[in-house]
Amino acid sequence: MNGMLTNHDTKNYGARYEAPVGRDGTRWGIGWSQSSYDLSTNSFYNSLGQSRGFSFYGLTPVYRDRMNRVTAIYGYDHRKIKDRLRLKAAGLAGIELTTEKMANVYHAGISGSQYLPNRFSQYSLIYWYGNLSGGGKSIDGDYHKLTSDLLHVIYDGKTNYRVQLSVQIANRNLDGSEMFYLGGMNGVRAYGASEGSGDIGFTATAEVRRQTGIKGLEAAAFIDTGAVKSHNAALIQHLSGWGVGLRYNLDNSWHAQLDYARKINAQRDKVEPRDHSGHMWFQLYKMF
């Protein structure tokens, strides 16, 4: 199970279950998720929305040796999305405009990892094909996109150094549910989860972690940066931030992460009702 709650009315939660199939190491899984948001970005209207989704996915080992693993990943998602604009301008307050959309999305790709002395790398490359209906001429129909993630860690005694990169490219304008977002706990942490959206984009992080002397607890310092662009706009948006945090890992059980991040160049928040100089994030989950 997973979940996220921000102090600006963005909520994401879901559950999934997976199990081994056959004898080759293949695992199949099913999942359910729901997200909602309530954003006040201007004085004319509030943006509200809700998305519910069901997913099926699989992971099949392709290659494995002592240091390398390569896995084929594939799946299907069915999503129902409802967007609302709640007008608040004089004379129009209380009026809502509603759009209901449906998406069927398929994906296939590879993920892998490599273990070397004092080094670890993890990567993925995934192709997505989807069809959206109900969103209007600019976004309805077929779309294609490619996503990739890379993590590289170097261990040096009590210290480790991490570099992480996430990239998305797409062939056309995308619905908000498929866009790439710069802000959030897995992006530029100095900005909110819906900040900086587009069809094409990247985020990059450099992080240093140091053992504190308390078992499982590390202190961290990091820099995040990213850029994003939409097909229907010439502007490229850049966001950057820096921060500090704590990481706690109990072997194969609990994981907790606390971060406080501040902006670099202090670009104003656009999707939150007030501007903030930084954000705090907390994540907790348990492995079963």
Language-model features, listed with the residues they occupy:
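Outer-membrane beta-barrel initiation region
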Residues: M1-R27, R64, I200
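Solvent-exposed loop/turn segments connecting transmembrane beta-strands
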Residues: G3-Y13, G49, G135-D140, G196-I200, ...
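Hydrophobic, lipid-facing positions within transmembrane beta-strands of outer-membrane proteins
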Residues: K11-A15, R52-F56, N104-I110, H144-L150, ...
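Transmembrane beta-strand segments of outer-membrane beta-barrel domains in Gram-negative
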Residues: P20, G25-V163, Q168-R172
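Surface-exposed coil/turn segments at beta-strand junctions on protein surfaces, enriched
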Residues: V21, D156, S197, N249-D251, ...
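Outer membrane beta-barrel transmembrane domains
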Residues: L39, G75, R79, R84-E96, ...
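Outer-membrane beta-barrel "beta-signal"
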Residues: L246-A256, Y260, D275-F288
